[in-house]
Swiss-Prot record:
Pfam families in the record: Ribosomal_S13
Record function comment: Located at the top of the head of the 30S subunit, it contacts several helices of the 16S rRNA. In the 70S ribosome it contacts the 23S rRNA (bridge B1a) and protein L5 of the 50S subunit (bridge B1b), connecting the 2 subunits; these bridges are implicated in subunit movement. Contacts the tRNAs in the A and P-sites.
Family: Belongs to the universal ribosomal protein uS13 family.
Keywords, ordered alphabetically: Ribonucleoprotein, Ribosomal protein, RNA-binding, rRNA-binding, tRNA-binding
Stored InterPro entries: Rbsml_uS13_C (IPR027437), Ribosomal_uS13 (IPR001892), Ribosomal_uS13-like_H2TH (IPR010979), Ribosomal_uS13_bac-type (IPR019980), Ribosomal_uS13_CS (IPR018269)
rRNA-binding keyword on record: yes
Protein name, entry field: Small ribosomal subunit protein uS13
Organism of origin: Xanthobacter autotrophicus (strain ATCC BAA-1158 / Py2)
Molecular function (Gene Ontology), one example: rRNA binding
GO terms, biological process: translation
Taxonomy of the source species: Bacteria, Pseudomonadati, Pseudomonadota, Alphaproteobacteria, Hyphomicrobiales
Region (Disordered): 95-122
Family matches, as SUPFAM superfamilies: S13-like H2TH domain (SSF46946)
Length: 122
C-alpha cells in the first residue's frame, strides 16, 4: 500500500482512480499527474516502482494543494469572508445558503432540521 500526501492509496486500483482518494485531486488532476510522471494510464498501484511513487509524491507536493493544507485554505477563505462582514460572510455565519438559493421552502440541509412553531396544534 503506497502512502502519498499522508493518504494510504489502495493497491489494487488503477493509479488514476487511486490518486482521487487524496482530498484535492480529482479525475483531471490525477490524469495530469500520471501524464507528467509518464506512467501508463492502465497501470495499477501495486505495479508501480518505488521511483515512480517518489515521482508522483514530488509532483503532488510541488504542484498541488492537497489534504490538510487545502482544508485549511478553504476554512481561512470562509473565515476571511465572515470577518469582512460581506454578504457571503453573513450567510456563512448564519448557516444559510451562500450562493443565492431560495430559503422559503428549501435549504433544509444548510439550515438543519425544521424547528416546530408554537401555536400550530389543533
Amino acid at each position: 500500500m503506497a502512502r502519498i500526501a499522508g493518504v494510504n492509496i489502495p493497491t489494487n486500483k488503477r493509479v488514476i482512480i487511486a490518486l482521487q482518494y487524496i482530498h484535492g485531486i480529482g479525475a483531471k488532476n490525477a490524469e495530469e499527474i500520471v501524464t507528467k510522471v509518464g506512467i501508463p494510464a492502465e497501470r495499477r498501484v501495486n505495479q508501480l516502482t518505488d521511483q515512480e511513487v517518489l515521482q508522483i509524491r514530488e509532483t503532488i507536493d510541488r504542484d498541488y494543494v492537497v489534504e490538510g493544507d487545502l482544508r485549511r485554505e478553504v476554512a481561512m477563505n470562509i473565515k476571511r469572508l465572515m470577518d469582512l462582514g460581506c454578504y457571503r460572510g453573513l450567510r456563512h455565519r448564519r448557516g444559510l445558503p451562500v450562493r443565492g438559493q431560495r430559503t422559503h421552502t428549501n435549504a433544509r440541509t444548510r439550515k438543519g432540521p425544521a424547528k416546530p412553531i408554537a401555536g400550530k396544534k389543533k
